[in-house]
Amino acid sequence: MVNLSGDEKNAVHGLWSKVKVDEVGGEALGRLLVVYPWTRRFFESFGDLSTADAVMNNPKVKAHGSKVLNSFGDGLSHLDNLKGTYAKLSELHCDKLHVDPENFRLLGNVLVVVLARHFGKEFTPDLQAAYQKVVAGVANALAHRYH
């Protein structure tokens, strides 16, 4: 559950309606893989991830980033039940993929950076604070199976 005021919810949803999921998702996942290179081990089947340029231009990274961001968008519609919304993804990432749950927090923070880059002054400190609450809630929900 994410506790947002009515104004925060409106602001989060308002900005999200402008997000180009394919573009932002690919960039967010790509930046995660570049900034935190140990995360690449989960994506070895994606081909060349040897350089920042290779990662950022990799079509499989872009496609998976889009998939991840679509899932994030689904969560925005269920802020009062994120654990239920992400229960199956939490199980997959914990039991089958063995992803360190810290990576969910890292990706959330990278997403906030990418949103700030794309939206500039429109991404105000108050909006950032609201998105930080959301990405923390999503990361917590995805890590739920680990507890």
Curated annotation (Swiss-Prot):
Red blood cells. This is Hemoglobin subunit beta. It comes from Lama guanicoe (Guanaco). The modification S-nitrosocysteine is found at C94. The modification N6-acetyllysine is found at K60, K83. Involved in oxygen transport from the lung to the various peripheral tissues. GO terms for molecular function: haptoglobin binding; heme binding; hemoglobin alpha binding; metal ion binding; organic acid binding; oxygen binding; oxygen carrier activity; peroxidase activity. GO terms for cellular component: blood microparticle; haptoglobin-hemoglobin complex; hemoglobin complex. The modification Phosphoserine is found at S45. The keyword Heme applies. Belongs to the globin family. Signal peptide: none annotated. Residues 3-147 form the Globin domain. The gene is HBB. The modification N-acetylvaline is found at V2. One of its GO terms (biological process) is hydrogen peroxide catabolic process. Pfam families: Globin. SUPFAM superfamilies: Globin-like (SSF46458). Heterotetramer of two alpha chains and two beta chains. Heme b binds at H64, H93. Keywords: Acetylation, Heme, Iron, Metal-binding, Oxygen transport, Phosphoprotein, S-nitrosylation, Transport.
